[in-house]
């Protein structure tokens, strides 16, 4: 099941981004200095007690020079469209404003659960002023302070009470779930239809015509699949035309439910910045990844074109160096038959478990080939390694000092593991841990 989504909505200057940052904390910080991985502050993962969720800050939408109330309306529409629960943010210092009432009218019609938050209640003396907010029609207002972090626990408790009940998906463990993600009109739905051999998903040359994520069970050569097709961005309202940020929302929710993620590119148009952003989310998820170049039939080419395009992909997506690249045409169905075997291969790699003795032989051979680094006269010592997880393969390496594990040496060890065990299409995680 995808994680529930909370949207924070409200007029400007009520502190939406401050509350967003308070809730997500360090989870939005960039931990890898790799080109192409952009953590978008408008959307992030959050956690409260035993609840995991995704959260949207609608204040991050760049509307441009639109009139004030139009901006508010567009932000509210995004929240209504995407969220399971909406936190309606107001400002306790200003009281109820006409703009708050405008937001309330829109949200009241949404029939989504609304939790009313009154921000900037920074001291107990201000609590008596929040009762005016009952007039907005959303029940008890929750006083909070983004500056001091006060009241967020009660607010999140109330939001979590409205999360959809989690239901187990009716697919067995042998079923491979894969999603197709990419910007609008790269041919995701056409590719689904090419695989299925039928017009199962509505397809149009208008970008964003797939209405939502669609699950399609599918079997081929005794292997069961579930295809999760996502719209890149719905054609609904000017807000979707004016920002690309929300194109990742459905992709992210589909990624959470996938074993394998297909990042679909438009071979005719080439690579743009939004492709890199979406691919970065695929990498960050830890899922197996395949890069699919669609519309290859429309590309003027010679014997060098494919190699040049592949080199361009590798240059732009350095963080996906492990992902195989498949060139095809959903329209003509050329090379589409090559896709499922690659999906099977990367899914298998994603689940590889290596015996501890074999793993340690490979690690020690790597150390003999390329001695561990030193820093300030101290040398990194590797004692032993063990695999602690699959999907993705995750290894703990016990060392004398974790600070001595330089990222370049970690990358060297990852490359040696790939050479030894394959790991096609899957990221590898290495955790350095000091031995007690």
From Swiss-Prot:
The keyword Oxidoreductase does not apply. Signal peptide: none annotated. Residues 4-167, 176-351 form the EngA-type G domain. Keywords: GTP-binding, Nucleotide-binding, Repeat, Ribosome biogenesis. It comes from the Bacteria. Pfam families: KH_dom-like (PF14714), MMR_HSR1 (PF01926). GO terms for biological process: ribosome biogenesis. Residues 352-436 form the KH-like domain. InterPro entries: G_ENGA, GTP-bd, GTPase_Der, KH_dom-like, KH_dom-like_a/b, P-loop_NTPase, Small_GTP-bd. GO terms for molecular function: GTP binding; ribosome binding. GTP 1 binds at residues 10-17, 57-61, 119-122. GTP 2 binds at residues 182-189, 229-233, 294-297. Associates with the 50S ribosomal subunit. Belongs to the TRAFAC class TrmE-Era-EngA-EngB-Septin-like GTPase superfamily. EngA (Der) GTPase family. GTPase that plays an essential role in the late steps of ribosome biogenesis. This is GTPase Der. The lineage of its organism: Bacteria, Bacillati, Bacillota, Bacilli, Bacillales.
């Amino acid at each position: 099941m995808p994680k529930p989504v909370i949207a924070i909505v409200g007029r400007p200057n009520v502190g939406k981004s401050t509350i967003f940052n308070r809730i997500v904390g360090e989870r939005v910080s960039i931990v890898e200095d790799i080109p192409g991985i952009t953590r978008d502050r408008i959307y992030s993962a959050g956690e409260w007690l035993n609840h995991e969720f995704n959260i949207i800050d609608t204040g991050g939408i760049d509307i441009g020079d639109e009139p004030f109330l139009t901006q508010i309306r567009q932000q509210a529409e995004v929240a209504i469209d995407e969220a399971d629960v909406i936190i309606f943010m107001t400002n306790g210092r200003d009281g109820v404003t006409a703009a708050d009432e405008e937001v309330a009218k829109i949200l009241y019609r949404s029939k989504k659960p609304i939790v009313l938050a009154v921000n900037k209640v920074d001291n107990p003396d201000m609590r008596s002023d929040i009762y005016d907010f009952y007039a907005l029609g959303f029940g008890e207002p929750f006083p909070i302070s983004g500056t001091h972090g006060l009241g967020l626990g009660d607010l999140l408790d109330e939001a979590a009470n409205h999360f959809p009940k989690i239901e187990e998906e009716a697919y067995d463990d042998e079923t491979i779930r894969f999603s197709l993600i990419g910007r609008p009109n790269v041919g995701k739905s056409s590719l689904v239809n090419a695989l299925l051999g039928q017009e199962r998903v509505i397809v149009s040359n208008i970008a964003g015509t797939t209405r939502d994520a669609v699950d399609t069970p599918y079997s081929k050569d005794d292997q069961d699949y579930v295809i999760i097709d996502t719209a890149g961005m719905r054609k609904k309202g000017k807000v979707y035309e004016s920002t690309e940020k929300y194109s990742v929302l459905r992709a992210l929710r589909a990624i959470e439910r996938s074993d394998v993620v297909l990042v679909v590119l438009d071979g005719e148009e080439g690579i743009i910045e939004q492709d890199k952003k979406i691919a970065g989310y695929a990498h960050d998820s830890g899922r197996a990844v395949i890069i699919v170049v669609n519309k290859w039939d429309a590309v003027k080419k010679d014997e060098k074109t494919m190699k040049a395009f592949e080199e361009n992909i590798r240059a732009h997506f350095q963080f996906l160096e492990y992902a195989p690249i498949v060139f095809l045409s959903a329209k003509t169905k050329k090379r589409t038959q090559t896709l499922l075997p690659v999906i099977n291969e990367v899914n298998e790699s994603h689940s590889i478990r290596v015996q501890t003795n074999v793993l340690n032989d490979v690690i020690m051979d790597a150390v003999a080939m390329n001695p561990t680094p030193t820093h300030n006269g101290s040398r990194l010592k590797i004692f032993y390694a063990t695999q602690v997880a699959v999907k993705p393969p995750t290894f703990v390496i016990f060392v004398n000092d974790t600070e001595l594990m330089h990222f370049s040496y970690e990358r060297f060890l990852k490359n040696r593991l790939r050479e030894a065990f394959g790991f096609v299409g899957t990221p590898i995680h290495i955790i350095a841990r000091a031995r007690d």
